[in-house]
């Protein structure tokens, strides 16, 4: 298998990823600004399928209408020259100080109204550029102190905002579903809708739940100590995996945004195995930050590494699934039994079946080994390249 990506692999990057200048809470920028059109061209050369953007990535906050038009024109030229797509867009409701207490859930009503209008304006541009999904990350929606935010009321306001956006895209005839991106903390001390499960439960209460799914990020779930492939499996099970952000994270700490692969390599393997075996058809979107130690050569090497690592893991996962010894080990671990309904004939057949309870020997069942370790070692052998 070739590890050279092509547009058919559907690898996409946010403009804010390769465009990150290396500025953090403890240090100034270590790289200059990148023109979005230049990012488009360089990513196309690497084999990417498309780019994504926040409104403020493409158009500086506060730009005049004429300046806005010029930025969009230059970006379009880059797309037209390269054939790159814009599968997703989102709104920056976190950088400007006006959003210090959030956008959709700010205590200040004027800020909430502005946040909804800012989002609507960028939805129009996203649709114009061909975006098929609109992501919403509420990085400032939360609190640092208990009395500062009535969470139940804040969730009312969050629901109201998403219902307004759903009403807007429906009224405009846009086929642009929303993907809510969970995160437990950072930049706020605690963020609303912190995990995939919280977001899925919230979506059920919206007026048009069919318009909303999730955009989980590797590092965000791992910051909460959760198993990311398990979370993705539940999102797929619910039919709500509308988009995904791929990166790397080493344990429960700040959001590292490593390139995809480093961090928890085993979790990355199981994630790729899941996405490919489940037939996920959406973009493989990288949301990472090239380390501030790197110059621009390092930026492009980091982006290329994201795609290469995915393709290597895809190859290893396919080999794992095709291995006859693995298939036998899966049967020994009773995965085929898990796929069988527990009571296929229903409750009325289960209740009188003495083999299910009265004649069941729990000690004998407890003595049966599950053979999980052998299966897991076969997976590790494939991941580490010890099997063909």
UniProtKB/Swiss-Prot annotation:
Pfam families: AP_endonuc_2 (PF01261). InterPro entries: Xyl_isomerase-like_sf, Xyl_isomerase-like_TIM-brl, XylA_actinobac, Xylose_isomerase. It catalyses: alpha-D-xylose = alpha-D-xylulofuranose. It is found in: Cytoplasm. Gene3D superfamilies: Divalent-metal-dependent TIM barrel enzymes. GO terms for biological process: D-xylose metabolic process. Co(2+) 1 binds at residues 181, 217, 245, 287. The keyword Signal does not apply. GO terms for molecular function: magnesium ion binding; xylose isomerase activity. Binds 2 cobalt ions per subunit. Belongs to the xylose isomerase family. The keyword Cytoplasm applies. The gene is xylA. Co(2+) 2 binds at residues 217, 220, 255, 257. Homotetramer. This is Xylose isomerase. The active site is at residues 54, 57.
């Amino acid at each position: 298998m070739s590890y050279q990506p092509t547009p058919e692999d559907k690898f996409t990057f946010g403009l804010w990823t390769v465009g990150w200048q290396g500025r953090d809470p403890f240090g100034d920028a270590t790289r200059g600004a990148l023109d979005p059109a230049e990012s488009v061209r360089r990513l196309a050369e690497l084999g990417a399928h498309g780019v994504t953007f926040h409104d403020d990535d493409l158009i500086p906050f506060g730009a005049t209408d004429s300046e806005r038009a010029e930025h969009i024109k230059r970006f379009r030229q880059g797309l037209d020259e390269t054939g790159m797509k814009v599968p997703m867009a989102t709104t920056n409701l976190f950088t400007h100080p006006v959003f210090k207490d959030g956008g959709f859930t700010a205590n200040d009503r004027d800020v909430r109204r502005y946040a909804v209008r800012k989002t609507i304006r960028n939805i129009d541009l996203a649709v114009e550029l061909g975006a098929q999904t609109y992501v919403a990350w509420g990085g400032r929606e939360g609190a640092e102190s208990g009395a500062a935010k009535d969470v139940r009321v804040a969730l009312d306001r969050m629901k109201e905002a998403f219902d307004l956006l759903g009403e807007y895209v429906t009224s405009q005839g846009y086929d642009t579903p929303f993907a809510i991106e969970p995160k437990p903390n950072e930049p706020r001390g605690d963020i609303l809708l912190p995990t995939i499960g919280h977001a899925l439960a919230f979506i059920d209460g919206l007026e048009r739940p069919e318009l909303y799914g999730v955009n989980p990020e590797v590092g965000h779930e791992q910051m909460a100590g959760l198993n990311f492939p398990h979370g993705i499996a539940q999102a797929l099970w619910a039919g709500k995996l509308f988009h995904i952000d791929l990166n790397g994270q080493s344990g429960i700490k700040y959001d590292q945004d490593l390139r995809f692969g480093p961090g928890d390599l085993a979790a990355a393997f199981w994630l790729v195995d899941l996405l490919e075996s489940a037939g996920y058809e959406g973009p493989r979107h990288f949301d990472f930050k090239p380390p501030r130690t790197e110059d621009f050569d390092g930026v492009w090497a980091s982006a290329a590494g994201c795609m290469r690592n995915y393709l290597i893991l895809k190859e290893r996962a396919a080999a794992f699934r095709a291995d006859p010894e693995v298939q036998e080990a899966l049967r020994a671990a009773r995965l085929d039994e898990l796929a069988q309904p527990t009571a296929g004939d229903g409750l009325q057949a289960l209740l009188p079946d003495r083999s299910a309870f009265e004649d069941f020997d729990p000690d004998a069942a407890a003595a049966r080994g599950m053979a999980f370790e052998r299966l897991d070692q076969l997976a590790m052998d494939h991941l580490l390249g010890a099997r063909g």
